[in-house]
């Protein structure tokens, strides 16, 4: 089929055109092809080598461009290119999968066994050539993994960056294919860095450079610093690409907030974000242990309190003057470190702080520190991702900007990305422990609880990212590509690339990255799991899909945990985060009533009414609330009446002080399968079939630790519905 035949079906009137515009449309598309097409230098070299060796060389293409236009396109890519034959499928009414190879052999009078064909389509080029006795060579445009990534990235681009043309990336994916082709055979971790992380961080480096240029001007001396630990990879890429002086500044939220305190409030704010904390950790953080604080911890089991409880009690436990004095000492040590680490610190007028993101807490704390010490250096944030509404309270002389800002993706999407960003942090992080203090300009670090194999994996991924950064510019020049020329285009595609990894991972990426642990490093040395698919399953059973999508950490990689459950659940999570999951479709609706048997410890029994709900995915949910004073020992669920045959996804338990607290509790416990008892029901793995109309699932009730317990049952019905 020729291009003219295709455009004959174009809806001309819809766009205010007539059939007379057909040729104009054809030429417009051909002009775009000429502008966007690039020659593959490796393939061109092989082509010319074969030509110089005296072989007959030419082209066979499945295309709607006729041989005349195909010739123009080839010579536009490489002026002076010559060939011995040129076949376009539209000229012959057949493609490589059917008769085009036969036409070529017949017209050229060539023995198929002496012919050699190179192509990038396994069906048309490879199988088509073999069918005619021609020796084929497969030359894929991209690996199967990279091609799959590109498909997912395009889907996410269209979902998350609505309104922008998904086909125009200024050569970003072409560049990734070319760089990847030159680094085949490396480890999976290296390839992840090369094809995913490297392109994102290289584009971010261009953004950081532009931020520095924006700050420059007469009378200004701009210095660039990367915030440790998450800015470690960005700093390495900076050194690889530019060699210009920049600082790697080891400072974190905890140190900066304490050092910025001139009242109790910054410490209260910090502790309020800590999940759990004990007395030794508190002493490490603030360097003092007043008797009242020690007594406070002594009142908790194992001496461990929540950060929220400590923050609420702290004003009555410590003299504010002690905190102010503590902060002043830390400021002195921090400034000594900054002067030693940042070239020309005292002559600097503007300090650009580069980091993954997100709300500029360290930048704001440094502003307070500089103000307290009379330092007039302006501070400018350059963040990979930004929570832009958090920057409204910046000092007037300071600024902050995110590469992936709310102008690139919506705040809904941004918060979904940041909810899953712990994976990126672990990959980009340095191998050192987090800073806890300074001494004589040197860094004093926490212990690093991450295992050696995790550090080695991160190092291999970083090596791949550095390899991309080191070769991308040269390859881009060779092929006349400029993927980072327009910041908003680069930012959108980097958002899609990053979202694909964080939000829609492949199975092999889950296997590679799933064992990673997150170094919480805020009041604890504990490592939090990145993945926990059973957690997600239990949340869906007990609380529903929307509640599972908004679950607090851990697990740190919630999207990956959904992916571990199933790819479809993973995509539902992404739709929810993009605000594209209608609750009236996917949430629960009443299916009907059912009578549940409740058996007391004293032998008494009663039937209680309960409601069966149906989810948007066709699963059935039953929730049974119990109070402690009911003294229930066993629950009998009439599965024969709910669904005579089905898949039991699980039984879960939540507890709380009242029904609302229990229902909203994220502390969901799965009841072990071996504890469940089936009466009149055949059971095989997760599948069951009721043998009688009275078939029941018996759930032994665990000892209650709070006033209310809610047992939830999740079933996918199979076969005929109950009468």
Region annotations inferred by a language model:
Residues 17-18, 34-40, 68, 77-78, ...:
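A generic "structured core" feature
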Residues 68-102, 257-260, 387-396:
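Extended hydrophobic/aromatic segments used for targeting, binding, or gating
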Residues 622-646:
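Extracellular beta-strand ligand-recognition surfaces/modules
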